[in-house]
Design a protein with these regions (language model features):
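A conserved, positively charged/aromatic
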Residues: 1-17, 137
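A nucleotide-sugar donor-handling region in carbohydrate enzymes
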Residues: 12-79
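A donor-sugar binding/catalytic signature common to diverse glycosyltransferases
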Residues: 19, 133-178
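Short acidic-hydrophobic, aromatic-tinged amphipathic segments that line or gate anion-handling sites
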Residues: 21, 41-42, 123-127, 184-190
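Helix N-cap/beta->alpha junction signal
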Residues: 23-25, 44, 104-105, 147, ...
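Donor-nucleotide binding loops and adjacent catalytic segments primarily
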Residues: 59-139, 244
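C-terminal amphipathic helix plus adjacent low-complexity
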Residues: 203-244
Length: 244
């Protein structure tokens, strides 16, 4: 409920004729909120299809050469919490490796206006394209992000043999099924918790204890299911909603 996009989600849930969910967790949430069971279906996440379709371009990206980064010797971070910049500096100090910060323009302005000095090992970079960003993720020492898609990306790359330590800077998640499988760590939003989470994720990755891919995140026929559900339900919606 504390996520800013939750208001939009709830509006869409109510006005949609059919709700297509990523998991049984999501379906139960919708049903508990009052959405009719006959209007909810589990299709899985489309992320695996998207990543698989683009995998060759992701793997052939030259982003490491362009940024002068050595694979497995940097930490990829994407965050918007000013209070955590000190933790980013602490990561640079502790691991003594480049911290690549994919920085949104608004975050850059906030950082500049605050006068906070980032460690010299922290590399600020404009938001990256899809191929470059995922190439960096799959080869990073660790990935620290507040993105809601991190669990899906971590699950997919684990399923294709490229697991990476995934740490999410949030106090809650709409992806509980990913926590069920241990595919990422929820770090909270304070510096101490973040460092502990990174340590945990990195150590478990070293021990090849990366968690298990979430089945709903590795399903590669999601688009086919969506098309068939829409086709199947169009007549029902026309009759029951639009009275055609």
């Amino acid at each position: 409920e504390c996520l800013p996009e939750e208001t939009n989600r709830r509006i869409v849930d109510v006005i949609s004729d059919v709700n297509l969910c990523y998991s049984e967790h999501a379906r139960r949430y919708l049903n508990a909120s009052g959405v009719a069971k006959e209007r909810t279906y589990v299709t899985g996440s489309p992320m695996a299809e998207v990543l698989h379709e683009n995998l060759s371009e992701i793997e052939s990206s030259d982003i490491h050469q362009r940024l002068h980064l050595q694979k497995g010797k940097y930490i990829d971070t994407e965050k918007n919490f000013l209070s955590l910049f000190s933790a980013v500096n602490a990561m640079a100090e502790k691991y003594d490796m480049p911290i690549l910060y994919s920085c949104h323009p608004r975050s850059r302005k906030r950082l500049e206006s605050s006068g906070f000095a980032l460690d010299r090992r922290v590399i600020q970079h404009e938001p990256l394209g899809f191929h470059d960003y995922n190439c960096l993720q799959m080869n990073a020492y660790a990935v620290v992000s507040d993105s809601g898609t991190l669990p899906e990306e971590s699950s997919f790359f684990t399923s294709v043999g490229h697991p990476f330590p995934a740490v999410c800077i949030r106090t809650s998640t709409e992806r509980p099924e990913a926590l069920d499988k241990g595919i990422f760590v929820l770090a909270g939003i304070d510096g101490k918790s973040l460092l502990q989470a990174v340590d945990t994720a990195v150590e478990m990755n070293r021990n090849e204890d990366d968690g298990l891919p979430v089945p709903n995140y590795t399903d590669e026929n999601v688009s086919a299911k969506v098309v068939k559900l829409i086709q199947s339900y169009t007549g029902v919606v026309n009759k029951m909603v639009w009275r055609k």
